[in-house]
Curated annotation (Swiss-Prot):
Protein name, entry field: Dihydropyrimidinase-related protein 1
Species for this entry: Rattus norvegicus
Subunit structure: Homotetramer, and heterotetramer with DPYSL2, DPYSL3, DPYSL4 or DPYSL5. Interacts with PLXNA1. Interacts with FLNA (via calponin-homology (CH) domain 1 and filamin repeat 24); the interaction alters FLNA ternary structure and thus promotes FLNA dissociation from F-actin.
Polar residues bias locations: 534-543
Database matches in InterPro entries: Amidohydro-rel, Hydantoinase/dihydroPyrase, Metal-dep_hydrolase_composite, Metal_Hydrolase, Metallo-dep_Hydrolases_sf
Modified residues (Phosphotyrosine): Y504
Annotated GO biological process: negative regulation of neuron projection development; neuron development; regulation of postsynapse assembly; semaphorin-plexin signaling pathway
Motif (Required for interaction with FLNA): 246-247
Length: 572
């Protein structure tokens, strides 16, 4: 349970807590027991526990005791067009804790061509000084350049990073070609990394954006129109196909449409190691808001891939999440203020992309999935915490209520009603894409590193109390299957005798130079070949002929042609 970090926090490790009378919910079992926490770890689980004196006791009164949520898709302090997203690491992680999430994995987004290592250190320093909860970092590969392989090796071997995101969209900025994706997947598999993919067809999006702007459509609806779900689905299919040829796991971030989700579900049935992550937004709302008459409201929903304009999509994605076709829920939390969004008031392609969700994620999942009977409480723990911990090699330190695991614990009230609104959320932005939603399920108490940070609606945190959690490569949940498949389904040549028969000699093909344009024709116009006049002939009876010296026979009168006479008027 050791970890690397820059600082120690004595006031956290001195806390001793006893949670009494709760019902422990893990991804695979539920049971009644007490839980004793000390030194930031779960020390005992059971009934009639013997604990030291002076321990603070929390009465759960039969309520659920679950592992703290893990949000693996956040963009705090993300740069965009000279701006940064509205919530920094303090504001964002504070909101996360208020919603029951006790760990995040944030995205490092380097400027294209800049050093991955330098960018990682920049993000690490910002998070280390501000984060209120434990955190880790993905590193996004925004360009495939000379020296990137060496930096990736250092990040995996020395910096505790085991996940990297590549982009199939954002043409001329982050987008990789298929051959670059193949190279990146192959190299990252060798490092034992988790490959995250932002899946959209960037080439076609660029064409659609141009076409729609030329039509005079400049508002947020243009964002959805230029990124139809077919372009998300096509890229998902292509990413899975590339990963399948290499036998490497692939994780599709921000699954937003039915089509994309269907492709993931079908692929998993056929065998590829693919994982899908819908976000709170795609589970809790839809893209009809892009057509709102209120520009600021419409712009608040702009994110990529866009929310589906089909209002039945959230329910559909929730069903696939419940049956295991999708495995993890993130938030994609990257909100910008209305003033920042207004940079694109005359051009939808300039609206900075991102929505809120870091605080609302767990409540939205409970309300849409568990309160409707689509999934049970164990599945809820799996898709909000445990599956992420297993995929990103945090398990069982995170994602489980077990002796020895980190004391990141939430007492959850499934019956508590909560209204999602910008008036009370912890994010700094003035809007909330879930505005007015009445939801079942909410945290009563949130414990991070063994310390109570949220209770009775009040949050008590300080900057920098979160720790960086390093992650080792080759997570068993993924790579155990990769190793077995390599042995069972590896490519092998056919053993056969040497061919000793004739071999056709292929003549060397001369290189033909392009003909120079003649003076009579324009070089820009292709001259068609001359057309033969079928009524003309070079045969002539005048003058000397080649057979003039041959002896000629005397003429004979032909009585009838071969086959006898014919009469074209007779059919008999």
């Amino acid at each position: 349970m050791s970890h690397q970090g820059k600082k120690s926090i004595p006031h956290i490790t001195s806390d001793r807590l006893l949670i009494r009378g709760g019902r422990i919910i893990n991804d695979d079992q539920s049971f009644y027991a007490d839980v004793y926490l000390e030194d930031g770890l779960i020390k005992q689980i059971g009934e009639n526990l013997i604990v030291p004196g002076g321990v603070k006791t929390i009465e759960a009164n039969g309520r659920m005791v679950i592992p703290g949520g893990i949000d693996v898709n956040t963009y705090l302090q993300k740069p965009s067009q000279g701006m940064t997203s509205a919530d920094d690491f303090f504001q964002g992680t504070r909101a996360a804790l208020a919603g029951g999430t006790t760990m995040i994995i944030d995205h490092v987004v380097p400027e294209p061509g800049s050093s991955l290592l330098t960018s990682f250190e920049k993000w690490h320093e910002a998070a280390d000084t501000k984060s209120c909860c434990d955190y880790s970092l993905h590193v996004d590969i925004t360009s495939w350049y000379d020296g990137v392989r060496e930096e990736l090796e250092v990040l995996v071997q020395d910096k505790g990073v085991n996940s990297f995101q590549v982009y199939m969209a954002y043409k001329d900025l982050y987008q990789m070609s298929d051959s670059q994706l193949y190279e990146a997947f192959t190299f990252l598999k060798g490092l034992g990394a988790v490959i995250l993919v932002h899946a959209e067809n960037g080439d076609l999006i660029a064409q659609e954006q141009k076409r729609i702007l030329e039509m005079g459509i400049t508002g947020p609806e243009g964002h959805a129109l230029s990124r139809p779900e077919e372009l998300e689905a096509e890229a998902v299919f292509r990413a899975i196909a590339i990963a399948g040829r290499i036998n490497c796991p692939v994780y599709i971030t921000k699954v937003m449409s039915k089509s994309a989700a269907d492709i993931i579900a079908l692929a998993r049935k056929k065998g590829p190691l693919v994982f899908g992550e819908p976000i709170a937004a795609s589970l809790g709302t839809d893209g009809t808001h892009y057509w709102s008459k209120n520009w600021a409201k419409a712009a608040a929903f702009v994110t990529s891939p866009p929310l589906s304009p089909d209002p039945t999509t959230p329910d559909y994605l929730t069903s696939l999440l419940a049956c295991g076709d999708l495995q993890v829920t993130g938030s994609g939390h990257c909100p910008y203020s209305t003033a920042q969004k207004a940079v694109g008031k005359d051009n939808f392609t300039l609206i900075p992309e991102g929505v809120n969700g870091i605080e609302e994620r767990m409540t939205v999942v409970w309300d849409k999935a568990v309160a409707t009977g689509k999934m049970d409480e164990n599945q809820f723990v799996a898709v909000t915490s445990t599956n992420a911990a297993k995929i990103f090699n945090l398990y069982p330190r995170k994602g489980r209520i077990a002796v020895g695991s980190d004391a990141d614990v939430v007492i959850w009230d499934p019956d508590k009603m909560k209204t999602l609104t910008a008036k009370s959320h912890k994010s700094t932005v003035e809007y909330n894409i879930f505005e007015g939603m009445e939801c079942h399920g909410s945290p009563l108490v949130v414990i991070s590193q063994g310390k109570i940070v949220f209770e009775d609606g009040n949050i008590s945190v300080s900057k920098g109390m979160g720790r960086f959690i390093p992650r080792k490569p080759f997570p068993e949940h993924l790579y155990q299957r990769v190793r077995i498949r390599s042995k069972v389904f590896g490519l092998h040549s056919v053993s056969r005798g040497m061919y000793d028969g004739p071999v056709y000699e292929v003549p060397a093909t001369p290189k033909h130079a392009a003909p120079a344009p003649s003076a009579k024709s324009s070089p820009s116009k292709h001259q068609p070949p001359p057309i033969r006049n079928l009524h003309q002939s070079n045969f002539s009876l005048s003058g000397a002929q080649i057979d003039d010296n041959n002896p000629r026979r005397t003429g004979h009168r032909i009585v009838a042609p071969p086959g006898g006479r014919s009469n074209i008027t007779s059919l008999g």
